[in-house]
């Protein structure tokens, strides 16, 4: 009986950090949502910076990316003048991730490709946005084998599971490829490797 109690206590102790992890982010995202409801952009940015700092330290990439993208959106809603600086910071983080985690760098590059594609027609601030978007898209898909081997679970809540996710074994390649509308490239890769279920 003592062995059973010991095992239960050990299991509970091992699960505690996971529960605390989830509760911390859930609490921070609720705090952020409250700041949004009250239209308090400075408070939103403060919470997002705390989420990003904690997530970077703990390698909770889904929370990190979600916080960083929301931060850029919040800064943009305050002042369009802050967009270039926020994007440059995001670019630096993408470059930094490229040195340590190719999958994380690919997601950063995918987001940057999407951002530059959307600003191309709206802004004189980014005169080469179209080409820059293509460059980031190319970087995002530079290592398809790494993305195909990486499950999207580590990128929640930034990435949400879709209805077709299981067809691609919930891999990151399908998310990046579909976001960038690289359907033919995905099809060619999956036909060659047989990664689809």
What does each model-found stretch correspond to?
Residues 17-18, 118:
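Charged, amphipathic alpha-helical interaction segments
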Residues 1-6:
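Positively charged n-region of N-terminal signal peptides that target proteins for export
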Residues 20-22:
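Boundary at the C-terminal end of the N-terminal hydrophobic targeting segment
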Residues 8-9, 75:
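General helical structural elements
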């Amino acid at each position: 009986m003592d062995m059973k109690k010991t095992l239960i206590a050990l299991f509970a102790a091992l699960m505690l950090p996971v529960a605390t992890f989830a509760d911390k982010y859930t609490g921070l995202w609720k705090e952020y949502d409250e700041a949004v409801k009250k239209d308090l952009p400075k408070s939103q940015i403060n919470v997002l910076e705390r989420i990003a700092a904690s997530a970077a330290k703990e390698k909770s990439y889904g929370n990190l990316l979600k916080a960083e993208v929301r931060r850029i959106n919040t800064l943009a809603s305050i002042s369009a003048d802050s967009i270039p600086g926020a994007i440059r910071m995001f670019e630096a983080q993408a470059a930094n991730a490229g040195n340590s985690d190719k999958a994380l760098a690919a997601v950063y590059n995918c987001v940057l490709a999407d951002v530059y594609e959307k600003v191309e027609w709206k802004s004189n601030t980014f005169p080469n946005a179209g080409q820059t978007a293509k460059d980031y898209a190319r970087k995002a898909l530079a290592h398809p084998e790494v993305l195909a081997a990486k499950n999207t679970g580590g990128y929640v809540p930034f990435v949400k599971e879709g209805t077709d996710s299981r067809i691609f074994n919930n891999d990151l390649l399908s998310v990046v490829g579909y976001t960038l509308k690289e359907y033919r490239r995905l099809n060619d890769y999956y036909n060659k490797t047989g990664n689809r279920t």
